[in-house]
Amino acid sequence: MIINEKANDIVTNLEDAERFSINADASMFAILSKKLYSNPIQSVIRELVSNAIDANIAAGVEIPIQVHFPNTLDNIFYVRDSGIGMDENELRNVFTYGGSNKRDSNAQIGGLGVGAKSPFSITESFTVESAKNGVKRTALCFMGPDGRPRFKMIGEENTSESGTKIYFSVADGYANFIRESVPVFLFSVQMPEILNGVETFCNVADVKNIEEFRKLRKLVEKDSHFCRPHMVGPDKNEYIVTKLLNITSQFFSGNIVVMGGVPYDVDISQVWSENYKVSQMFNFDNYSKVAIFHFPIGSLAFQASREKLNYTEDTKKQLQKRYV
């Protein structure tokens, strides 16, 4: 994603002024990892899934990414893509805070240079396997005794595959990973291949299995538009829509925008000075009060955690255009 940071023109005669710098100590890395996300599990799933989808898009492959959920028999969580992979230099760049190879195009979702390191918010170490040009490289990312993250290449072997896999073990709370993946997968650009024999995809909104969840996704995809909101109402499919409404109400306030497959709550009070309600603006009396707005990648600003929108003047203008 192209990051639009505007440079400020300042006229000054202070020629000896020094630039600010960042002290890369343990407290700073804690801010960038363990303290960055309010919902770490959902954020890790979102960031790794988004990166994997980006990798597939860049490689032009239509093979779905793989997501492996932990359980009592196999406690590994992983996300795997079928992209072009990374060599050692590319791995070192991606796993440097602020490092990103996605800032020249809005075809990909990421770009801030923190998402690949998101597992540090819930684990002390994770492993990266990346295959490119016939060589698979394995790197270990771990938190050092000084509280600063470390990166070490630990293996290299020949392979006919390509792509990247990021994985780590989960001690407990397996069901939380399944639950927190719901809002990520509901709007994601690709529906991943879900592994590890998960029979109950989620325990919310009476969605009992993956097939019912896929029906919800089809409804969202069928009615997705990039110009005007669509209002999901019982007149379309009461059985499915009711479940969609139940799901969104558990994770969102009701006003949702989606950019690059990532959903965000909209705080209407941030968009207008008056406290408008979407239900009043759209006369939702005969609908289920769910409006989904789709925006092109790069059109809205978001916070560093990507959990919430950043209500810049440009973002507010974009939102105002859709709400009228």
Regions found by a protein language model. Give the residues of each.
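Short acidic loop-to-helix transition motifs that present clustered carboxylates
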Residues: 27, 72, 112
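Interdomain "switch/hinge" adjacent to the Bergerat
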Residues: 1-22, 55-109, 135-324
